[in-house]
């Protein structure tokens, strides 16, 4: 991870690093499918109008154009396109907005509630830094309903993510949960109608601190010092159980939307507290910057690595996807896979047992044995044992060094006994043990069959 990318913000993994990423993706996929989520993939490009319908991300979007089109504009043969043309194509910056479009276009072919997972590259024109890249992989789960969606799914998706993250070698993590209705109802209850502006300011709390947020609330939202103090008092509430309800009510603010949000959040937190103890807290400072969230919102941090920011976030959206009078409310969470893997590698949180899939290297001492060596490898592969064959005869020592350099645990030798009959032996180059083996039935230990990714020893 100390290598410098030739193109800033676009990471390329070495084989051992890629194995760690693949382990993360495989673990997530397996967990998602155990919970009944179906995998899909959407196109890499959307129209600019589709991407910018919700949220303030226009400066982060990569627009797409044909090189020939740019040349025609430069030559004066056609007018340049309006940069803000809603029909212009651009790379998607997340998977939620494309998924909303996918649901609308395919609603007649989907069974609702529709449970989907999606793992793809996304692109954002951000300033590259630790934990932030311009091209990165996300892994999303969402449940979408037709017309309505039970609030129980808000807890369901969080439990799935808690299980998925708990299966990874990343140590402790914490899912921080809030509710937009609770926050917006509170702000309106204290007389602040620009709830979106308040949320944007509160969303900066961990980066700039309470004094700066108080200033932003007063200068940009028009809050009085007392209103700013009340908004910050709400954001200061954090509990591991439903006791946050009493603490909010103790602030003396009333509003119908506030009560609705309190009830929804209490139900989610109670379920998480019961089924995933120690994995989640109610944290009323969580705002989430995107405008399409309408209820429960989540952010997840690695304990001890909070400065990395959220590795998994999302929430409830009731109006992101619609078709005429038909509305498709949903709730989902997204893991920043690249961000997570970058931290796993840089902090040596997990390591791959080897950098290649090969378990057995079939050595050659005579070039005329190459075809027979291929037969040995074929027998091994038929039983699911990854094997490769030397392309030319060399001294055993050189071939063992080659296997060791690549991390291949076993070397297969073909020889002949005193009577000239073919004999086979396999050597564990880590321990030096060598014994007779039959290519038709020999199997390596289960832990050596494929590369293993495990939490590094402290």
From Swiss-Prot:
UniProt feature coiled coil, ranges: none
GO term, biological process aspect, one: histidyl-tRNA aminoacylation
Family matches, as SUPFAM superfamilies: Class II aaRS ABD-related, Class II aaRS and biotin synthetases
Superkingdom of the organism of origin: Bacteria
Entry's localization field: Cytoplasm
Alphabetically ordered keywords of this record: Aminoacyl-tRNA synthetase, ATP-binding, Cytoplasm, Ligase, Nucleotide-binding, Protein biosynthesis
Entry-linked InterPro entries: aa-tRNA-synth_II, aa-tRNA-synth_II/BPL/LPL, Anticodon-bd, Anticodon-bd_dom_sf, His-tRNA-ligase, HisRS-like_core, HisRS/HisZ
Gene3D superfamilies named among the record's database cross-references: Anticodon-binding domain, Bira Bifunctional Protein, Domain 2
Enzyme Commission identifier(s): 6.1.1.21
Protein's UniProt keywords contain Acetylation: no
One MF annotation (Gene Ontology) recorded for this entry: ATP binding
GO CC aspect terms: cytoplasm
Reaction catalyzed: tRNA(His) + L-histidine + ATP = L-histidyl-tRNA(His) + AMP + diphosphate + H(+)
Quaternary state and interactors: Homodimer.
Record-stated family: Belongs to the class-II aminoacyl-tRNA synthetase family.
Protein name, per record: Histidine--tRNA ligase
Protein source organism: Micrococcus luteus (strain ATCC 4698 / DSM 20030 / JCM 1464 / CCM 169 / CCUG 5858 / IAM 1056 / NBRC 3333 / NCIMB 9278 / NCTC 2665 / VKM Ac-2230) (Micrococcus lysodeikticus)
Lineage summary: Bacteria, Bacillati, Actinomycetota, Actinomycetes, Micrococcales
Gene name of the record: hisS
């Amino acid at each position: 991870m100390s290598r410098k990318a030739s193109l800033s913000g676009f990471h390329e993994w070495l084989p051992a690093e890629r194995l760690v990423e693949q382990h993360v993706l495989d673990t997530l996929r397996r967990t998602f499918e155990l919970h009944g989520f179906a995998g899909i993939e959407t196109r890499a490009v959307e129209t600019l109008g589709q991407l910018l319908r919700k949220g303030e991300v226009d400066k982060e979007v990569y627009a797409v154009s044909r090189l020939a089109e740019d040349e025609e504009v430069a030559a004066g043969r056609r007018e340049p396109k309006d940069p803000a043309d809603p029909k212009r194509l651009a790379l998607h910056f997340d998977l939620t907005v494309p998924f909303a479009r996918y649901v609308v276009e395919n609603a007649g072919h989907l069974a609702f509630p529709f449970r989907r997972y999606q793992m793809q590259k996304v692109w954002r024109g951000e300033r590259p830094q630790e934990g932030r890249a311009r091209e990165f992989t996300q892994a999303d789960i969402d449940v979408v309903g037709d017309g309505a969606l039970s609030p129980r799914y808000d807890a369901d998706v969080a439990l799935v993510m808690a299980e998925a993250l708990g299966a990874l070698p990343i140590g402790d993590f914490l899912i921080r949960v809030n509710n937009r209705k609770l926050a917006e109802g509170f702000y309106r209850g204290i007389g602040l109608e620009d709830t979106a502006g308040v949320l944007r300011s509160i969303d900066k709390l961990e980066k700039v601190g309470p004094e700066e947020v108080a200033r932003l609330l007063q200068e940009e939202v028009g809050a009085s010092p007392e209103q700013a103090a009340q908004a910050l008092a709400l954001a200061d509430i954090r509990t591991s159980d439903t006791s946050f309800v009493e603490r909010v009510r103790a602030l003396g603010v009333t509003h119908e939307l506030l009560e609705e949000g309190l009830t929804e959040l209490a139900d989610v937190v109670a379920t998480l507290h019961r089924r995933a103890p120690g994995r989640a807290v109610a944290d009323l400072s969580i705002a989430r910057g995107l405008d399409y969230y309408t209820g429960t919102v989540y952010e997840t941090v690695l304990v001890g690595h909070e400065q990395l920011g959220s590795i998994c976030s999302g929430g409830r959206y009731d109006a992101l996807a619609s078709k005429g009078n038909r509305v498709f409310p949903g709730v989902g969470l997204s893991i920043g896979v690249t961000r997570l893997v970058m931290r796993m590698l840089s902090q040596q949180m997990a390591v791959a047992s080897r950098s290649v899939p090969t378990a057995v290297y079939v050595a050659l001492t005579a070039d005329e044995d190459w075809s027979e060596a291929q037969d040995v490898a074929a027998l091994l592969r038929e039983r699911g044992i990854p094997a490769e064959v030397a392309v030319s005869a060399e001294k055993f020592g050189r071939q063992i060094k080659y296997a060791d350099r690549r991390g291949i645990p076993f070397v297969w030798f073909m020889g002949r006994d005193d009577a000239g009959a073919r004999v086979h032996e396999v050597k564990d180059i880590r321990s030096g043990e060598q014994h007779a083996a039959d290519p038709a039935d020999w199997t390596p230990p289960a832990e050596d069959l494929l590369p293993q990714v495990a939490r590094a020893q402290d």
